[in-house]
């Protein structure tokens, strides 16, 4: 059984979380399989996916914990978070701050990533026990928001989500992101049923992030 610290390290080292939004549970599973085949381990199934909890349970039963790191996204409350953890999620991501969700995840020693947009919100999330703080919607400010927050809070582990793509992912990493959350720019091929494209895009993201990390280390 992998610990929370080990799972956090896996996310940080890979530098990316695949954010899965889909029109059906079947499509979500295919996307998850494609991004995994492309080398991405951390896969976030959002609660907007029909049957999202069953998708999480299916993935948890299909793959070993060292093969895939399943998370639940768009989680708004502690009740939903607990259901997802029981289904097999190893981390919980929220677009906003909810103290009860953070408490619950810490109770079960699972990773929790609440959403924030300002230094005040990030600090509040960290003080409440957040492991990583999701910066959302990141596209409103671009990579400079990471630099701005890490000015007074250099210790803050930040996960920008929204607006991250192959053309700018290097900028987000250079700015100091813990990792990046990528949705449509990664999984867009699924809309036309091209899961090979999703796999190829995942490979490109992994390559670019690794290259950027090597250059900045």
Please report, for each region that a protein language model flagged, where it lies by residue.
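Short, charged, surface-exposed secondary-structure boundary motifs
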Residues: 101-105, 123-128, 143-148, 168-170, ...
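Glycine-rich beta-to-alpha transition loops that act as phosphate-gripper elements at the mouths
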Residues: 21-23, 70-78, 94-97, 114-119, ...
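Catalytic cores of alpha/beta
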Residues: 31, 77-87, 120-128, 164-180
């Amino acid at each position: 059984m992998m610990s929370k610290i080990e799972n956090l390290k896996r996310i940080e080292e890979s530098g990316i979380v695949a954010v899965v939004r889909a029109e059906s549970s079947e499509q979500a599973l295919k996307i998850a399989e494609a991004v995994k085949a492309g080398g991405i381990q951390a896969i976030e199934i959002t609660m907007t996916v029909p049957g999202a909890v069953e998708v999480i349970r299916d993935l948890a039963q299909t793959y070993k914990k060292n093969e895939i790191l399943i998370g639940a996204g768009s989680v708004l409350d502690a009740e939903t978070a607990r259901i997802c953890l029981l289904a097999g999620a190893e981390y919980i991501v929220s677009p906003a701050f909810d103290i009860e969700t953070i408490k619950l995840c810490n109770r079960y020693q699972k990773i929790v990533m609440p959403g924030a947009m300002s230094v005040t919100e990030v600090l509040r999330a960290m003080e409440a026990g957040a492991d990583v703080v999701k910066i959302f919607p990141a596209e409103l400010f671009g990579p400079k928001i990471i630099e701005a927050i890490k000015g007074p809070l250099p210790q803050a582990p930040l996960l920008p989500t929204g607006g991250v793509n192959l053309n700018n992912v290097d900028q987000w990493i250079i700015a100091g992101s813990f990792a990046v959350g990528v949705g449509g720019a990664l999984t867009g091929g699924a809309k036309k049923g091209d899961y090979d494209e999703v796999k190829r895009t995942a490979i490109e993201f992994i390559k670019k992030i690794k290259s950027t990390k090597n250059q900045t280390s």
